[in-house]
Amino acid sequence: MADAVMSDAHLLGFNTRGTKRESDQQLHLGSSGASGAGVKRQRVEPEQQEPGNPMSMPVSQAYQGFAPLNSQGNQEPTATPDTMVQPFAAIPFPPPPQNGLSTDYGSQHTQDYATQSTEHGIPLYGGGQSLAEHSAPATSTANASSTTDGSQTEGQQSQSQNNENSETKASPKRLHVSNIPFRFRDPDLRQMFGQFGKILDVEIIFNERGSKGFGFVTFETSADADRAREKLHSTVVEGRKIEVNNATARVMTNKKSVTPYGNGWKLSPVVGAVYGPELYAVPGFPYPTAAAAATTAAAFRGAHLRGRGRTVYGAVRAVPPTAIPTYPGVLYQDGFYGTELYGGYAAYRYAQPATAATAATAAAAAAAAYSDGYGRVYTADPYHTLAPATSYGVGAVASLYRGGYSRFAPY
């Protein structure tokens, strides 16, 4: 009987190792010390005789999925391939954190291992094609993410450029308008430029004689300022072609202090000669000699010196100097102090008329003695109330405007 079972097993393709394993298993369950071959024959024969025994079905047959040979009284359902033990499936791990970004923007987690389907047989791992299939989506995902990042960067750059352009257009802009009619005032300039946009400020530059013929107009936006400049530049207004340009910031440069005097003095020659004659001695200046100075000082000793700074004037200053035209040219750098202004006055001071009265002559001598030689007389001078000489003319007035300081100047 056992030989028949073994022959049937060989015909059906059974592996005899399962039978041996099953007999070994049966051996451990409590059989006495019998040989392996005898136990195998002893256990196969009772299995066919006892169909109701739950241990009658061989383990190898149930594991391989085949029905037992003698299943006459077996009440258990036949095992199918669907009820086989499934191999280990990869657990889907959660995706890594994306630094606060939602999962929509993060790269999707791809399954690292392929699950074995029941249709395939023994192989638990996929071939090279499956690996390529899984690596291709990862590569495409990386390319897609890099493309998305590049597009986002380009979008941010374009948006920042648009913001800069809008800020530039929205910033105020100042225009310089020149050659405007002299009768124009701020309302006239505002009316002329107001048609192009909102104006923040209008300013026409004036001096003590009136309008200087140019001004500034500040628009709220640079776009309006550019449009006004294009429309109004080189247009003729009341016979004058006005010019409209972009106003530039005034550059404040630190100019080197160049002394206006040729001899390198730090102070004006007039101031230096008055308050410190011994410090500012000019070559060629007609100072008296020491003996003449001593004689003059002795003659004027005890006399009451009137005027400012009596302690400043020494024996040298007590002697009346010669006429101003004989002074060296280095002393006067401008017409304001030159003979253009004081030449006539000095001429009539030192050229007294011969027919003058004795009192007038004495007064003139006293005036010459007590004056400082620069037109300032500190005593009663009968000629002091006379009008200036004819040499005080247009040239002197022009030099006053050019060289002097005017409080009406806008700069």
Swiss-Prot record:
One of its GO terms (biological process) is mRNA processing. Residues 16-175 are annotated as: Disordered. The keyword RNA-binding applies. Residues 58-83, 99-119 have a biased composition (Polar residues). Transmembrane segments: none annotated. SMART domains: RRM. GO terms for cellular component: cytoplasm; nucleus. Residues 173-249 form the RRM domain. GO terms for molecular function: mRNA binding. It is found in: Nucleus; Cytoplasm. The keyword Electron transport does not apply. Its main location: nucleus. Pfam families: Fox-1_C, RRM_1. Residues 135-165 have a biased composition (Low complexity). The record marks 174, 182-183, 207, 212, 216, 240, 250 as: Interaction with RNA. InterPro entries: Fox-1_C_dom, FOX1_RRM, Nucleotide-bd_a/b_plait_sf, RBD_domain_sf, RBFOX1-3, RBFOX1-like, RRM_dom. Keywords: Cytoplasm, mRNA processing, mRNA splicing, Nucleus, RNA-binding. RNA-binding protein that regulates alternative splicing events by binding to 5'-UGCAUGU-3' elements. Regulates alternative splicing of tissue-specific exons. Interacts with papd4/gld2. This is RNA binding protein fox-1 homolog 2. It comes from Xenopus laevis. The gene is rbfox2.
